[in-house]
Amino acid sequence: MIGLIQRVSEASVCVGNEVIGEINQGILLLLGVEKNDNEEKAKKLFQRVLNYRIFSDQDSKMNLNLQQVGGGLLVVSQFTLVAQTNKGNRPGFSQGASPELGKTLYNYFVELGRSSEILCESGKFGADMQVRLINDGPVTFSLNV
C-alpha cells in the first residue's frame, strides 16, 4: 500500500462539478492499493499518516502530527501510484489490486479515518475526479507499507 501525503493549507475533490470532499489545513493523501495489501497494512498506513510529523512547531521544525495541529485528512484513490515505471515508456500495473480489493481496502481506510477523532473526507473510488490543493511548503512524502 502506497500513500503519497501532501501537507496542504486547503484541498478539495470534485466529481463532475460537485465538491464531494474538502478540508482546510491538513493532509491530502493519494492512496494506491497493491494486490498483496490487506486490512493490517491499511491500519499500519493509517497510523503512519496520523502520526507522521510534517507540521511545523514554534521553532519551524517538522515536529507536529495531524492530530496535534487539528488538521483534516482528505483521502483520494490513486491507482497510478502502484505503477511500475522502471523500464519502457508505458507504465505497468501488474502490482495493482483488483478493483474489488482496491475498493474494499480504500473504503476500509476511509472508515478508519472517520472513526478516529480527526475530520476525514474522501473522494470516490474509481471515479474521474478533479483534485484541487494548495500544497503548503511544498511538503510531500511517499509512505510505503
Swiss-Prot record:
Q: Which GO terms describe its molecular function?
A: D-tyrosyl-tRNA(Tyr) deacylase activity; Gly-tRNA(Ala) deacylase activity; Ser(Gly)-tRNA(Ala) hydrolase activity; tRNA binding
Subcellular location, record wording: Cytoplasm
This protein's GO cellular component annotations are:
cytoplasm
> Carries keyword Cytoplasm?
yes
Q: What Enzyme Commission number(s) appear in the record?
A: 3.1.1.96
Q: Which CDD domains match?
A: Dtyr_deacylase
Which terms are listed as keywords in the entry? Cytoplasm, Hydrolase, RNA-binding, tRNA-binding
What processes does the entry annotate via GO biological process terms? D-amino acid catabolic process
| Principal cellular location given in the protein's record | cytoplasm
Name any one Pfam family assigned in the record.
Answer: Tyr_Deacylase
Its recorded reaction(s) are: glycyl-tRNA(Ala) + H2O = tRNA(Ala) + glycine + H(+); a D-aminoacyl-tRNA + H2O = a tRNA + a D-alpha-amino acid + H(+)
- Placement of sequence motif Gly-cisPro motif, important for rejection of L-amino acids: 137-138
Q: Write down the HAMAP family for this protein, in alphabetical order.
A: Deacylase_Dtd
Q: Explain the purpose of this protein.
A: An aminoacyl-tRNA editing enzyme that deacylates mischarged D-aminoacyl-tRNAs. Also deacylates mischarged glycyl-tRNA(Ala), protecting cells against glycine mischarging by AlaRS. Acts via tRNA-based rather than protein-based catalysis; rejects L-amino acids rather than detecting D-amino acids in the active site. By recycling D-aminoacyl-tRNA to D-amino acids and free tRNA molecules, this enzyme counteracts the toxicity associated with the formation of D-aminoacyl-tRNA entities in vivo and helps enforce protein L-homochirality.
Question: How does this chain assemble?
Answer: Homodimer.
| Record comment regarding domains | A Gly-cisPro motif from one monomer fits into the active site of the other monomer to allow specific chiral rejection of L-amino acids.
**According to its UniProt record, which protein family does this protein belong to?**
Belongs to the DTD family.
Quote the protein name from its UniProt record.
D-aminoacyl-tRNA deacylase
